[in-house]
Amino acid sequence: MMTQNELENLVGCYIHLEGYTDLRSIYNVLRQEYPGEFDRKPALEAIRKLLKEERD
């Protein structure tokens, strides 16, 4: 199971390196690439947090 920090690092990579800009696409990629490695709620929190930081 991934930690919150690992999730945030991974999400940051998808935002900055891959150019993903919306919650749904990032979450779907995580589900496909890392099935069963994380819980839904912490993943969505990490995505929301980093997308908000990116916009600010």
Segments the model singles out, each with a brief description of its role:
Residues M1-D56:
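Charged, compositionally biased, marginally structured helical/coil segments
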